[in-house]
Swiss-Prot record:
Pathway: Carbohydrate biosynthesis; 3-deoxy-D-manno-octulosonate biosynthesis; 3-deoxy-D-manno-octulosonate from D-ribulose 5-phosphate: step 2/3; Bacterial outer membrane biogenesis; lipopolysaccharide biosynthesis. Its EC number is 2.5.1.55. Belongs to the KdsA family. GO terms for cellular component: cytoplasm. It catalyses: D-arabinose 5-phosphate + phosphoenolpyruvate + H2O = 3-deoxy-alpha-D-manno-2-octulosonate-8-phosphate + phosphate. It comes from Helicobacter hepaticus (strain ATCC 51449 / 3B1). It is an enzyme of class 2 (transferase). This is 2-dehydro-3-deoxyphosphooctonate aldolase. Keywords: Cytoplasm, Lipopolysaccharide biosynthesis, Transferase. NCBIfam families: KDO8P_synth, PRK05198.1. InterPro entries: Aldolase_TIM, DAHP1/KDSA, KDO8P_synthase.
């Protein structure tokens, strides 16, 4: 099972390392392929006044320290094409945000690196249309078609994070997992799927109480891994606190997901 977890944004090295330390029990499990996640910049915050992060240079420096201290593989976001070569020096996975999932130049630049490319499905996207984004990356790396096998070979992943459902709300169509998994490995982002974009007066809201339910459903349907942002105290988080999982609640949830995944895969023979 792939697991990407960590705080939404880098707040400080102390906060970053505290979460990294709390996640060690998960990272040490043989059945979990763990990636530590944190963003150096939240470039699409609702308000200009909202905290964005330390920026590219300082953020990568802090993530590099986490990598050295804990031995973690790193995943972080990219926002502009020029950042790819810099991020690739630190990150093992470069993530293309949902709002940028169709940006050809960005996808191509990330695909030119030797890092895994994780493309988040836009909240506005038909899941079947994500094969075009996948194919941009695959062809950049010398492949020819968007199939699960070629996506896996060339290191191209997709992440489901919910679809727009009216104003300020998202819903998860579990069929999306099946559709996208026909042409790429799929990660389920359980924390952003419970986000309520822009619904909290100048910032996004959310309801993390729904995270376990959606995650268990995704495990039963079948995915390649999970993305879950976490914080020691989500109420004090500087970004996405309402939809993050408290770190001490994450470990038992992940074990439960692993059990469900094993059960359903055995029954389905996959």
């Amino acid at each position: 099972m792939i697991l990407m977890s960590g705080p939404c944004v880098i707040e400080s090295y102390e906060a970053l390392s505290a979460v990294a330390q709390a996640l060690k029990p998960l990272s040490e499990k043989a059945h979990i392929d763990f990636y530590f996640k944190a963003s150096f910049d939240k470039a699409n915050r609702t308000s200009l006044e909202s905290y964005r992060g330390p920026g590219l240079e300082k953020g990568l420096e802090l993530l590099s320290e986490i990598k050295k201290q804990f031995g973690y593989k790193i995943i972080t976001d990219i926002h502009e094409s020029y950042q790819a070569k810099h991020i690739a020096k630190v990150a093992d996975v470069i993530q293309i945000p949902a709002f940028l999932c169709r940006q050809t130049d960005l996808i191509v630049e990330v695909a030119k690196t030797e890092r895994i490319v994780n493309i988040k499905k836009g909240q506005f996207m038909n899941p079947s249309d994500m094969q075009h984004s996948v194919l941009k990356a695959i062809k950049t790396r010398g492949g020819t078609q968007a199939t699960y096998e070629q996506s896996q070979k060339y290191g191209i992943w997709l992440t489901e994070r919910g679809s727009t459902f009216g104003y300020g709300n998202l819903v998860v169509d579990m069929r999306s997992l099946v559709i996208m998994r026909s042409f790429a490995p799929v990660i389920f982002d359980a924390t952003h799927s419970v986000q309520m974009p822009g619904a909290a007066g100048g910032k996004s809201g959310g309801d993390s109480s729904f995270v376990p339910y959606l995650a268990r459903a995704a495990a039963a349907v079948g995915v390649d891994g999970f993305f879950m942002e976490t914080h020691l105290n989500p109420k004090e988080a500087l970004s996405d606190g309402p939809n993050m999982v408290q770190t001490n609640a994450l470990i038992p949830l992940i074990e439960q997901l692993y059990d469900i995944e094993n059960l359903t895969q055995h029954k389905n023979g996959k």
